[in-house]
């Protein structure tokens, strides 16, 4: 279980081993070419032992047997080589996480718990078995670097186990392929009888292939994948025929039902260990993680995402549960993380379960996911008498070497000097460049595959090449680069060890007297390339530090050293690494270059500019990621989301990044908001909040505010969403701008910026005009609203202090620019006007607006936008009345109570595009209708029965059904009534609730 959950469960290369042995018995032939051998199902069977085995382990459950107990050799090997190393790595990561934990008391408690248990039990069984620690384990497993370490442990560990326990390698009862009978096409059934080496039957496996029920699942990135064919194997639960231990490993199938190549294969494995009576017992299940099921029913098939592809496993949910019960029975306690199948992990939509039509959403997976990347493995160098058998189809061309050259390993087995003699003789004899590269690769691979003095021997080989006078300088560059490529592809040498070799190679080449600076730079750049391909950031950082140190310590001139450091920086800058890591690596190179006075001021400036660009890009991405998190946070309501995104907006405005990056960031944030699945009112509120945050910023220059508003509207206009939604969000932005009443002139400029933002999009002219009209309409509404608020409580006939009225006159002058001519504009030469004149003019303007408000607003609308067909207040009222009548009429067409309730919910509560006034008027009309209907029913003597009086509360209800007396009684009573009183009450209640919610 658990991190036995890997894809390399022990069987993927069975056929490879067999064919390897076969080939070794043949005469020397042409070199073996890489093949696309498909993976196959495998099994192993170990005869009964004289000692009883123990329950199998479960990685994180604390069920590992004690050291003095003897277990099945394969399980024991997995335990020691893979699982314990993984647990140590996980524990280390948890300790790192605890160091950063805010709750210091809890962190210290957990740290002590781990440290103290380590002293008693290196396996940390209790810690990993405690459900309370699940959160710490899950958090650790989310770290990409830890995942890579765990995967690396598994790859190396399983590789060793496969070699040791393969039947093809002579291990008695070792792994071999399952031989299925020919498939019976009519029913898609096939079977096989599994036998041990003595020919005794162990069990019969039945396999059913399903091609008639395709279903769709979603990958992590949201991509939908259709599964057209999958299979289910009836794994045995009890084995009572032959004694011993057995391991069944079934390869996962691709989405089309075919088997993958061996270098991509993953497996579902059942481990049956010898029990007290000698018979195999099901004690362990290994599978890749996270394991998911295509539905909730017993026939739902298991599947996983691995290396970006979807694979189905040969087990159904029902069979898996059955197997897990048996595992629990023999282990005596629950199984670990990998075996948990919480009901909420799968979500089925569309057709019913029987038709297997689920959609599994990407976030519904176990956090403790461990997936192994596809790896390219370099084959070991074998003596010349044996042809090479390459294991994967992805071997670089340079690895396919002529077998006649393969004497390097034999030479190295005598001494390093013999190897050098062999290489030098070959280089002198062979003038073909490719053959020379093959020869050097062979020697380098022999060194890397030999654990003894690996690093020292590698340095000796590099020196030999650089100083070999038989090679031209350009040839030396090609040969050294080929050796560096061999280092890169070697899977058996840890990255930290490789980094030392890179440092040494750079030092040797830079100090060489017979290479030009350009040739030295080419080799340096290749070394950096190899370093940047390392699996984890620590190894990469160590290697870059080593290479930087080698440049600084070299005998190059200061100028050439500076050029080399810039070359290192350029390689890092152009890499695919994260911005955060680029910052770290570039910063380190720059710091050392400055401290040692190697980098010139110009070079320092160039590297600093690259760093600044990365920092800006990182800041932008961080802000965008933060907004995505806010939008997706289920704990945040709209108010909280708006406040949080306002904070992000302010943070962007205050950050030291360039105006260009600020604009891109604000545009991206707005576009994400606009395209989010939130309802349009929520999105409008958030955009309004962004507008307010920009307009009300107190220290920002007006020109920068204007540019920021333009970027936000560009994000709205460019978003892929409905035009009506864009119009509402544009209005929201204008509302946000008007929330700040500090400077009407700046407000006016920001309104122009909204238009520019619209123009930045690629929308059709009609849509652009519609957005601009929406902005104008919102601006006019806000200006009118501000006037109305200013008029409240004013008695314009009473004298007011000069300042109060003068200020109001100024406000109106700004707001009605190009619309109303004020005393200030009419008399530019007459700045010294009397208080009375100002008061009279202002009073006149305010009176005009307040007395004939409707007329003024209509005129203002027409003057502000004569071409944009804005509606007058009367037109809006008429439209509203018409809409109310339509809604009331449509409600009348709904016959059942359920339909009427649905109508109320959809049209009067959920539909935010309708104004509050329309919805409230509709509710009032419908309430009047319902009250009228009820009144008519009461007044009509023909239907005024005793039953009706019972419902009216004039006599007591008598129970009819003990289960639901009131409901049954009501049904009986109103069945005789022309107006269904109960339903009438329901509808009135629903309408009143709707009114309250508005």
From Swiss-Prot:
One of its GO terms (cellular component) is cytoplasm. Coiled coil: none annotated. Pfam families: 120_Rick_ant. Residues 1-69 are annotated as: Disordered. Residues 12-21 have a biased composition (Acidic residues). This is Antigenic heat-stable 120 kDa protein. Keywords: Cytoplasm. Residues 46-68 have a biased composition (Polar residues). InterPro entries: Rickettsia_antigen_120kDa. It comes from the Bacteria. It is found in: Cytoplasm. The keyword Manganese does not apply. It comes from Rickettsia akari. The keyword Cell division does not apply.
